[in-house]
């Protein structure tokens, strides 16, 4: 039984889901739905972890990572460490549609965006400046992502230098994802034609080291889509999760016959075998419109589903 069109979205980002659904229910394209949904979160600054004015880096700057994938062509567009451009997922789509590349990063991705007609503007807000200044001056740069450097990053701000001799201590988990700090929007859609698309958008980890790129823009990590199978998206501690390509793994598990929920579980277990306490979740959607999710390191994980069988969106919450 085919259930399409359908869109699933990480966390309780219902406005983004509704926007994507508006595109899909009128026979629109999955790719457009994912981009439009992402734009909503970038503009609404979903939980301050998507879009401008959130998650300042060590220097106080907000930079964006985004990704979009077309499961009908296997084409990808991605941007990382994007500076001074609000609409990261749209820039990612421009990389896909106006270049033969897949991925642009940093200052020169900004140059490309400006050439493509995007407006350059500061991504900082009063709120992000205040958050940063508290971290820098009241909290002595705690928490941060440094290790094996001097001065001791657990007590002091930089500039840091590497320690000559060090014992690699277990760094406390800095990246806390909970219902107040959702770190990424991830979205997977199947349209009425059966085309699959997936995408992500995020401003990354709060107080990240400048230049840090998370899992969101990495194909197969943040999201993945393949018309012959379905799609998946991931959210959580990107530094850890990207090493396991969970979205790719979930799609491959579905290819081998696993249900979306079991496929997501396998992807999560592959990570938790090495990092039992990592925080994250994977959502998966088959080309026929079956869906499921799995999570780790938080108590529960909500995701949004919208399809023809529902009058409005439904927030489905699973236990981790």
Swiss-Prot record:
SUPFAM superfamilies: N-terminal nucleophile aminohydrolases (Ntn hydrolases). Disulfide bonds join 41-46, 141-157, 295-320. Gene3D superfamilies: (Glycosyl)asparaginase. Substrate binds at residues 212-215, 235-238. InterPro entries: Ntn_hydrolases_N (IPR029055), Peptidase_T2 (IPR000246). It catalyses: N(4)-(beta-N-acetyl-D-glucosaminyl)-L-asparagine + H2O = N-acetyl-beta-D-glucosaminylamine + L-aspartate + H(+). Pfam families: Asparaginase_2. Coiled coil: none annotated. Belongs to the Ntn-hydrolase family. Cleaves the GlcNAc-Asn bond which joins oligosaccharides to the peptide of asparagine-linked glycoproteins. Heterotetramer of two alpha and two beta chains or heterodimer of an alpha and a beta chain. This is N(4)-(Beta-N-acetylglucosaminyl)-L-asparaginase. It comes from Spodoptera frugiperda (Fall armyworm).
């Amino acid at each position: 039984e085919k259930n399409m069109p359908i869109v699933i979205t990480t966390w309780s980002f219902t406005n983004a889901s509704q926007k994507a659904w508006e595109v899909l229910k009128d026979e629109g394209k999955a790719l457009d739905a994912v981009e439009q949904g992402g734009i909503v979160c970038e503009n609404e600054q979903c939980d301050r972890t998507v879009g401008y004015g959130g998650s300042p880096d060590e220097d106080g700057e907000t930079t964006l990572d985004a990704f979009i994938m077309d499961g009908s062509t296997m084409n990808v567009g991605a941007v990382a460490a994007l500076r001074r451009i609000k609409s990261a997922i749209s820039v990612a789509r421009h990389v896909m549609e106006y270049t033969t590349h897949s991925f642009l990063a940093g200052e020169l991705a900004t140059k490309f965006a400006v050439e493509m007609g995007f407006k350059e503007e500061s991504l900082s807000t009063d709120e992000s400046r205040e958050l940063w200044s508290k971290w820098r001056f009241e909290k002595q740069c705690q928490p941060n992502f440094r290790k094996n450097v001097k001065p001791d990053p657990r007590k002091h701000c930089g500039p840091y230098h590497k320690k000559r001799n060090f014992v690699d201590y277990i760094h406390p988990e800095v990246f806390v994802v909970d219902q107040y700090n959702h770190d990424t929007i991830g979205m997977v859609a199947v349209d009425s034609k059966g085309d699959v698309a997936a995408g992500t958008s995020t401003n990354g980890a709060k107080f990240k080291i400048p230049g840090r790129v998370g899992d969101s823009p990495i194909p197969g990590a943040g999201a993945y889509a393949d018309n012959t199978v379905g799609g998946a998206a991931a959210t959580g501690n990107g530094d850890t999760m990207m090493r396991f390509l969970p979205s790719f793994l979930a799609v491959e598990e579905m290819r081998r016959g696993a249900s979306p929920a079991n496929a997501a579980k396998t992807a999560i277990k592959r990570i938790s075998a090495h990092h039992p306490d990592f925080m994250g979740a994977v959502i998966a959607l088959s080309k026929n419109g079956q869906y499921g999710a799995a999570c780790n390191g938080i108590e529960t994980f909500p995701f949004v589903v919208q399809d023809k069988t529902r009058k409005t969106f439904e927030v489905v919450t699973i236990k981790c």
